[in-house]
């Protein structure tokens, strides 16, 4: 077992966040720590999207949604701000093609997190939140495994 898990800008790319968090929890020592960094939508290309609800995250978990899930592709295409994409600028057509090939490139943000969703999800997974920081581009959470 590990003392800590660090995840920076990963969980939003996972189709089933609760399943991932519970797996990460399994590799943590009892009372091990996790540093979780998620994108803050106001500072990136997700700013036009609605925040994901805990009910949606729970539904993905209960339905055992896997990484081939394309449920969010239309929203990711329709509300993606091409001007805020970091790195090389791309056309809408390129964005659509990248999104369709998500299983290979893992570009899609399946979910848009906010403080409420983070707290609900981590509480469900039995993590104790020790600190939370909101920056323009990042939501930073430091928590502890409650096992």
Region spans (language model):
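S-adenosyl-L-methionine-dependent methyltransferase catalytic module, highlighting the catalytic core
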Residues: 18-19, 23-26, 33-146
């Amino acid at each position: 077992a590990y003392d800590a898990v660090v995840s920076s800008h990963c969980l939003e790319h996972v189709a089933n966040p609760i399943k991932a968090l519970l797996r990460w929890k399994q590799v943590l020592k009892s009372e091990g720590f996790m540093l979780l960094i998620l994108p803050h939508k106001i500072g990136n290309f997700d700013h036009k999207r609605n925040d994901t609800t805990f009910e949606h995250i729970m539904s993905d978990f209960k339905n055992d949604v896997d990484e081939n899930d394309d449920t969010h592709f239309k929203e990711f295409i329709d509300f993606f701000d091409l001007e805020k994409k970091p790195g090389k600028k791309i056309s809408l057509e390129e964005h659509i093609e990248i999104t369709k090939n998500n299983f290979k490139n893992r570009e899609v943000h399946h979910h848009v997190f906010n403080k409420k969703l983070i707290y609900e999800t981590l509480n469900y997974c039995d993590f104790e939140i020790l600190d939370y920081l909101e920056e323009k581009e990042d939501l930073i959470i430091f928590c502890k495994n409650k096992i």
